[in-house]
Amino acid sequence: MNIIDRFKEKILSGELISKKEAIILSKENVDKLASAANDIRMSLCGKKFNLCTIINGKSGRCGENCKYCAQSVYFKTDIEEYNLLDSESIITSAISNYNSGVHRFSVVTSGKKLTNKEIDIVCKTYSEVQEKCAIKLCASHGLLNYEELVKLKESGVIRYHNNLETSRRFFSNICTTHTFDEKINTIKNALKAGLQVCSGGIIGLGETMEDRIDMAFTLRELNVDSIPINILNPIKGTALENQEKLSYDEITKTFALFRFILPEKQIRLAGGRALLNDKGERLMKSGVNSAISGDMLTTSGIKTFDDIKMIKELGFEV
């Protein structure tokens, strides 16, 4: 039995692989690794595919200096800037997405965190969404504390999103205005508040494969529910506008490794896949079982109708 199959069988028997074993796997053939990751997904997660959409609920003028982000005040980009969206716009979007077949809907806002007044406004909006449609609500409002997260939970939010972005080791290379530990604390507080957690990161920032593996193991330790993996889309004006893009093999290997490390979780294809020539179809055969559909925060995405068609053709149930 080869190394890939040996570790696959270990996972299917109920054990978890170690970081050392993940690094060994990272040296293996990408196509064989992807096929095994798909076997793990099929055996442990089945055919169900989870689709979510996001809306940019507050855009630009962010005081954080994340090098990849078009919304940071540190960079001169062409993105639209606006304050918190009105409730009607958010509710209309939620209902529209629900009617298109999406399972989850998230409001994502720029900035380190929302103000108390803004939290009260979005909580009222979430309650109104729940009265009008059955879509599952997610939220991404920055580094909130426990009490603020409890408010979200009480308003109908089921899952809180807060990306680690990368490994602890590499984090200070992409952001210095907040810390990796602040993110960890937010995730722990969300779990304590009774919320599910969606947390992943961005690949292609200049990090190593070991950094990605480290991030995956941190997420496993935190026991998050959904792991969105974004592929860097270098945006003109940001510090990473000239960052070299990852090869599709490198991207595929990363997604497959995340399935090996987090065998029963939602490995979610997120931003950047519109850059891929097959819109991520290869990744959906490499361990992925969820995706963000539609537009991203500041870049165009893939229409939900087209996503559902492709996902069903691949044998998934949406």
UniProtKB/Swiss-Prot annotation:
Q: Which UniProt keywords apply?
A: 2Fe-2S, 4Fe-4S, Biotin biosynthesis, Iron, Iron-sulfur, Metal-binding, S-adenosyl-L-methionine, Transferase
The record lists the catalysed reaction(s) as: (4R,5S)-dethiobiotin + (sulfur carrier)-SH + 2 reduced [2Fe-2S]-[ferredoxin] + 2 S-adenosyl-L-methionine = (sulfur carrier)-H + biotin + 2 5'-deoxyadenosine + 2 L-methionine + 2 oxidized [2Fe-2S]-[ferredoxin]
Give the family per the record: Belongs to the radical SAM superfamily. Biotin synthase family.
This enzyme's EC code(s): 2.8.1.6
Any one of the GO BP annotations: biotin biosynthetic process
Co-factor(s)? [4Fe-4S] cluster; [2Fe-2S] cluster
According to the entry, every stretch annotated as the Radical SAM core domain falls at: 44-273
Its quaternary organisation is: Homodimer.
One GO MF term, please? biotin synthase activity
Its pathway?
Cofactor biosynthesis; biotin biosynthesis; biotin from 7,8-diaminononanoate: step 2/2
What PROSITE patterns does the record point to?
A: RADICAL_SAM
> Which residues bind [2Fe-2S] cluster per the record?
S106, C138, C198, R268
* Uppermost EC category: transferase
Q: Which residues bind [4Fe-4S] cluster?
A: C62, C66, C69
Described purpose of this protein according to its UniProt entry: Catalyzes the conversion of dethiobiotin (DTB) to biotin by the insertion of a sulfur atom into dethiobiotin via a radical-based mechanism.
Supply the source organism for this entry.
Answer: Clostridium botulinum (strain Alaska E43 / Type E3)
Q: What is the free-text note on the cofactor?
A: Binds 1 [4Fe-4S] cluster. The cluster is coordinated with 3 cysteines and an exchangeable S-adenosyl-L-methionine.
> Is Oxidoreductase tagged as a keyword?
no
Q: Which InterPro entries match?
A: Aldolase_TIM, BATS_dom, Biotin_synth/BioAB, Biotin_synthase, Elp3/MiaA/NifB-like_rSAM, rSAM
Protein name per the record: Biotin synthase
- Plastid keyword on record: no
